[in-house]
């Protein structure tokens, strides 16, 4: 089957937005990475730790989830898109801080004190 000139033009025009969109997304990712001044190793460690913390509270689909840097209007954000399978109930009780000094104190990290 021979392609007409119109078919060729339509085919070419449909690919351009997809290619341009992909190139733009890649450029935004590179810019976000550069602006954040984070090494690849540090970003990977952050992703791992974020997934571990979220997994304490909800069951997530790690294979479908993503943690990425996104830039929009000169602002870089760390974005986590994590599909939740179900919540985990009754396993963890959160301790509310009594005052600001407890939030700032590294001594209270990892303690299991009850209010």
UniProtKB/Swiss-Prot annotation:
Cross-referenced Pfam families: MinE
Keywords: Cell cycle, Cell division
InterPro entries: MinE, MinE_sf
Annotated spans, Disordered: 93-115
Keyword Cell division carried by entry: yes
Family according to the record: Belongs to the MinE family.
Job description of the protein: Prevents the cell division inhibition by proteins MinC and MinD at internal division sites while permitting inhibition at polar sites. This ensures cell division at the proper site by restricting the formation of a division septum at the midpoint of the long axis of the cell.
Protein name: Cell division topological specificity factor
Gene behind the chain: minE
């Amino acid at each position: 089957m021979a392609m007409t000139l119109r078919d060729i033009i339509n085919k070419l025009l449909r690919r351009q937005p997809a290619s341009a969109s992909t190139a733009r997304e890649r450029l935004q990712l590179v810019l976000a990475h550069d602006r954040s001044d984070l090494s690849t190793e540090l970003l990977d460690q952050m992703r791992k730790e974020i997934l571990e913390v979220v997994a304490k509270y909800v069951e997530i689909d790690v294979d479908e989830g993503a943690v990425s840097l996104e830039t929009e209007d000169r602002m870089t954000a760390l974005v986590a898109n994590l599909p939740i399978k179900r919540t985990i109930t009754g396993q963890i009780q959160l301790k509310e801080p009594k005052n600001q000094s407890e939030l700032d104190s590294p001594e209270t990290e990892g303690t299991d004190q009850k209010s």
